[in-house]
UniProtKB/Swiss-Prot annotation:
Role according to the record: Peptide chain release factor 1 directs the termination of translation in response to the peptide chain termination codons UAG and UAA.
GO molecular function, one term: translation release factor activity, codon specific
Modified residues annotated as N5-methylglutamine in this record: 234
Location of this chain's protein in the cell: Cytoplasm
Protein biosynthesis recorded as keyword: yes
PTM characteristics: Methylated by PrmC. Methylation increases the termination efficiency of RF1.
PANTHER family named among the record's database cross-references: LD18447P
Gene designation: prfA
Protein name: Peptide chain release factor 1
Amino acid sequence: MTSPLDGLIAEHAEIEGQLADPAVHNDPAKARALSRRYAQLAPVVDLARELDRVEGDLAAARELALLDPSFRDEVQDLGEELARLNDRLRAYLVPIDPDDARDAILEVKAGAGGEESALFAGDLLRMYLRYAERRGWKTEILDANPSDLGGYRDVSVAVKARGPAGPGDGVYGRLRFEGGVHRVQRVPVTESAGRIHTSAAGVLVLPEAEEVDVEIDPNDLRIDVFRSSGPGGQSVNTTDSAVRITHIPTGVVVSCQNEKSQLQNKESALRILRARLLGAAREKAESEASLARASQVRTVDRSERVRTYNFAENRISDHRVGYKAHNLDQVLDGELDEVLDALAAADLDARLAAQAS
């Protein structure tokens, strides 16, 4: 067994034993957390088995190659496969973020730039929906505030995986680097003189919280209802179906008007509220932890301007890792893996460096 994985494999076996104990399921929060962690560690066991197999095959092929030179090609192939597996192993050499395996709630908000910014927010929404489709994830629009020209002033989407994932490969683990300000440079549809304008939209990515993850006292909530409004502010419903929830202790406010049912809007608003409260708690913990590592390394954290989309040059630039590519049309069609891989690799390198220092 490969030593860097031994602790994680032992943890996987321990959790398996805990989940087999009926008493654990009397505590839904604990059972859910254990199940999530168990699924997250499953790829570790698979990787360990694969490493053992390839190492054994390589040792045997090397011995055979001493007697028969025709086995040298097999030695080379197995050596390359082992190198790929060891590269995957790097992801397990740093602590696995338990939130990486969670589903996510993604919020896109138009920023500076008026209607053009709202149109760009719509472009970003489509990009993420197409990416989710490519990954086989399920999406659900929780709330949407459309603009006059078909964009979005703000929109919230739940993104769910269909099965367990490895480190950094869950929905939240994959999308978490998207948080920040995204900037667009192009000629707006509202521009008659053909001048290039710059506008922006903000993206927030939160791990989705279950009810058992975040306890909300109903007495801490102020719930207001109002009529839904569409583009231009016109009413789209004759009943007070839209819901605004204020979490009094923190001042967090969530509004939902996407559904015709007040109950459905309330449920969606509570989902977003739980995610925001969990995200706030996570950021507080990360902020405290970052004080200890700040002098060691700068990881790929959210920053003000994370990415620029230049339509005239068909160029995408991620400013955190110096990534540039002239395939903007493909990226906006959901081909995000290349830039997300670059961000994940930079983050892993930074965390490995911090761990070694």
